[in-house]
Amino acid sequence: MTDQAIPRAAIVVAMPDDIDYGTADQAYRQLYAAFAAGIPVVIADFTVTTYCDCTALRRLLAVQSWAAASHAELRLAVPPTSPVRRILQITGLGQQFRLYPSAGHAAAAPRIPVPRSPRS
């Protein structure tokens, strides 16, 4: 996996070909690290990913929750014909994420403010 810096305070994290029980932790550790470094927009690039199992989906949901709690954005670059896009559609999880056809499209999209919860 490689990280590719792009403008506008975002970073692209390339996901591996296959994400399953054995590889999910390593893949998503890079996403967490980017958010922990203060990057406000992290793009998970699934362009070359041809397989992901339920472990990968659970980790992705966890990263999404963590990003939202940190007032950051997780964007997914998933080509329209990708098997990953199909999995997200079948499971209904595609509605939980900001999906883009490429990392370039994800990077060019305007930042969507994450609502901050009021403090008591």
Q: Which residues make up each language-model segment?
A:
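Short beta-strand/loop segment at the start of cytosolic alpha/beta domains
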Residues: 1-14
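Conserved beta-strand termini and adjacent loop/short-helix elements that scaffold enzyme active sites
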Residues: 15, 77-79, 100-102
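Amphipathic alpha-helical interaction surfaces in cytosolic regulatory modules
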Residues: 21-97
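Short, charged, intrinsically disordered terminal tails
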Residues: 98-120
